[in-house]
Amino acid sequence: RDLRMSRGLGDVYKRQSKTYMIAIIDYNAGNLKSVEKALHFLGEDCVITRNFHEIETADKVILPGVGAFGDAMEQLKKYELDKVIHQVTAENKPFLGICLGLQLLFEGSDESQGVEGLHVLDGQILRIPDQSGLKIPHIGWNSLHLQNDGRLFAGLEENPYVYFVHSYYLKAADEQIVKATTQYSTTIHASVESGNTFACQFHPEKSGTVGLSILKNFAKLQGGNA
């Protein structure tokens, strides 16, 4: 099946704003198009944007990304996207952080010490400990241990395999929000859920049918305080 992109990044400020089901936040990070392509494959209406109106009026919002924590926070603040992220998460709009997008939701990262994260959720991003025989970054497929009935994982098998690419990992302050863990040198908090704010360290858009099921579960969520 043809999974080519039907929309490029373009200049979001030159087009007339409209309402989309899912807004994918554009902050000059990598991997945005892979997320859009996966959502289009699922038949979901989505747009890559940094337009405030499109983000605020979307039913759901995704913050993907591959890159460095400090650079990403600089870009979010440059476009004042940190403000709209705080707004939509406070409104309990379904929000999904992916990989770097997960890390940015927390307090700070060993990767960019002294740089404050978004503080949407409590926890720190730590470097994966060195261990003999394990390469860092952690790249490849790994199994998840599901716990605490995460809505993203509804209908999935007990220990699904998903795709990771990262050198830093989440240590959430509240383990009740942790919905999946994986093992790689240490216990990694691989997915969290707090209200309608969700985040995955792995890449659902690169995780085959399991990842598509996770994205579909996110797309089916109700927004606001419903």
Where are these regions (language model features)?
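A short, aliphatic-rich alpha-helical micro-motif
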Residues: 6, 55-56, 89
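Cysteine-nucleophile active-site neighborhood
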Residues: 67-139
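Pocket-forming structural segment of enzyme catalytic cores
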Residues: 108-184
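Single conserved hydrophobic/aromatic residue that forms the stacking wall/gate
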Residues: 1-16
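Short acidic low-complexity segments
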Residues: 46-57
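Short, surface-exposed beta-strand/loop micro-motifs that present aromatic residues
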Residues: 187-193
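N-terminal beta1-alpha1 ligand-phosphate binding loop
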Residues: 22-44, 205-206
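Acyltransferase
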Residues: 200-226
